[in-house]
UniProtKB/Swiss-Prot annotation:
Disulfide bond positions: C45-C56, C57-C70, C60-C79, C82-C98, C101-C116, C104-C124, C126-C140, C143-C154, C146-C162
Recorded name of the encoding gene: FAS
Gene3D superfamilies: Death Domain, Fas (1.10.533.10), Tumor Necrosis Factor Receptor, subunit A, domain 2 (2.10.50.10)
InterPro entries (UniProt xref): DEATH-like_dom_sf (IPR011029), Death_dom (IPR000488), Fas_rcpt (IPR008063), TNFR/NGFR_Cys_rich_reg (IPR001368), TNFRSF6_death (IPR033998), TNFRSF6_N (IPR033999)
Official protein name in the record: Tumor necrosis factor receptor superfamily member 6
Cytoplasmic topological domain: 189-323
Listed GO biological process terms: activation-induced cell death of T cells; immune response; motor neuron apoptotic process; necroptotic signaling pathway; negative regulation of apoptotic process; regulation of stress-activated MAPK cascade
Keywords: Apoptosis, Calmodulin-binding, Cell membrane, Disulfide bond, Glycoprotein, Lipoprotein, Membrane, Palmitate, Receptor, Repeat, Signal, Transmembrane, Transmembrane helix
Record carries keyword Transmembrane helix: yes
Segments of this protein annotated with the region Interaction with HIPK3: 204-305
Membrane topology term: Single-pass type I membrane protein
Organism field: Bos taurus (Bovine)
Length: 323
C-alpha cells in the first residue's frame, strides 16, 4: 500500500513540475513586455518636446537660447534672450547658443535693408547703382554707365541695358565703305605688280658695252633646254607641259622610253613641248608658268649666255678691225 502512495507522489511531482515552469515563463513574458513598454515610454516624448535626461522639456522660443534644463516633464527650461543686434534665433529650439547676425559688406556693394533682431537675421540689399543677379547674393556689381542712352534702367537684380551709338555705328559703316574700294585698289596694284614681274622675265634685256639692248621675248630656247631641265624637278616639268597642251599619251610615251633616266625624261618633255609650241613667245610661256625663283634662274642662264655671246662677238670684231 505504501508503494502505491510513493508512485502516486512521483506522478504528481512530474506533472506539477512542467506546469510551474510554464507559469513562470508566462510571468517572465509579462514582465518582459512591461519592461519594453516602460523603456519605450522612457525614451519617447510628445511631439514638440525634446528629451533632456529623464524629462521631456519644452523648447526655448525664437529670440532666446537655453541656459538651464527643465526640472520636470512638460516644463520649460531656463531660457535667456539673445544679444540684440548681434545674435538671433528664428525658430523654437533647445540649443544653448544663438546664431550670429550676418554682416552686409559695403566693399562688396551691399548695405543693410533690415537690421538684425533677436528673432530675425540681417537682410542685405545692393547699394544704389549696384546689382546682383545670383541667389544667394554674396556681392553686388556696379551698374553699367550708358553713353548713348538707356533701354532699361539698372535694378537691384539686373544690369543697365544701353542703347548703341547710332552715330558711332554710322561712322563704322562710312569707314567700311571707304575701306572697301581702297582695299580693292591695293589688291589690283599688287596683282598688277606680280604680273609685271613675270612679264619682266619675258621683256628682260641684256645690254652690251655700246648700250644696245637684246629683247628675250623670242629667244631661241633650243640650246638652253638641258640647262633649264637641270633646274626643274620632273614633277614641275610634267605639270608645265601638261598645262601647255601636251597630250597625256605623249607624256607617257616619253616617260616609258626613258624609264631609268629622269634627266633625259625632263629634257625630252621640254624639247617636245618646244618643238610643238615654236620659238615665238616660248620663253614668256615658260617663265610665266614657273615659280618666281625658278623663273629668275632660267632668266639668268639665258641672259648670261647671250651677254657672253655678244661680248665674244665684239672682241672678234675688234680683232678683225686691228688686222
Amino acid at each position: 500500500m505504501s508503494g502505491i502512495w510513493v508512485h502516486l507522489s512521483l506522478i504528481f511531482i512530474s506533472v506539477s513540475g512542467p506546469l510551474s515552469k510554464g507559469e513562470n515563463a508566462h510571468m517572465a513574458g509579462i514582465n518582459s513586455e512591461g519592461l519594453k513598454l516602460n523603456i519605450t515610454e522612457a525614451n519617447s516624448c510628445q511631439e514638440g518636446l525634446y528629451r533632456e535626461h529623464q524629462f521631456c522639456c519644452q523648447p526655448c522660443p525664437p529670440g532666446k537660447r537655453k541656459n538651464g534644463d527643465c526640472k520636470r516633464d512638460g516644463d520649460t527650461p531656463e531660457c535667456v534672450l539673445c544679444s540684440e543686434g548681434n545674435e538671433y534665433t528664428d525658430k523654437s529650439h533647445h540649443s544653448d547658443k544663438c546664431i550670429r547676425c550676418s554682416i552686409c559688406d559695403e566693399e562688396h556693394g551691399l548695405e543693410v535693408e533690415q537690421n538684425c533682431t533677436r528673432t530675425r537675421n540681417t537682410k542685405c540689399r545692393c547699394k544704389s547703382n549696384f546689382f546682383c543677379n545670383s541667389s544667394p547674393c554674396e556681392h553686388c556689381n556696379p551698374c553699367t554707365t550708358c553713353e548713348h542712352g538707356i533701354i532699361e534702367k539698372c535694378t537691384p537684380t539686373s544690369n543697365t541695358k544701353c542703347k548703341g551709338s547710332r552715330s558711332h555705328a554710322n561712322s563704322l559703316w562710312a569707314l567700311l565703305i571707304l575701306l572697301i574700294p581702297i582695299v580693292l585698289i591695293i589688291y589690283k596694284v599688287v596683282k598688277s605688280r606680280e604680273r609685271n614681274k613675270k612679264n619682266d622675265y619675258c621683256n628682260s634685256a641684256a645690254s652690251n658695252d655700246e648700250g644696245r639692248q637684246l629683247n628675250l621675248t623670242d629667244v631661241d630656247l633650243g640650246k638652253y633646254i638641258p640647262s633649264i631641265a637641270e633646274q626643274m624637278r620632273i614633277t614641275e616639268v610634267k605639270e608645265f607641259v601638261r598645262k601647255n597642251g601636251m597630250e597625256e599619251a605623249k607624256i607617257d610615251d616619253i616617260m616609258h622610253d626613258n624609264v631609268h633616266e629622269t634627266a633625259e625624261q625632263k629634257v625630252q618633255l621640254l624639247r617636245n613641248w618646244y618643238q610643238s609650241h615654236g620659238k615665238k613667245n616660248a620663253y614668256c610661256t615658260l617663265t610665266k608658268s614657273l615659280p618666281k625663283a625658278l623663273a629668275e634662274k632660267i632668266c639668268d642662264i639665258v641672259m648670261k649666255d647671250i651677254t657672253n655671246e655678244r661680248e665674244n662677238a665684239n672682241l672678234q670684231n675688234e680683232n678683225e678691225n686691228l688686222v
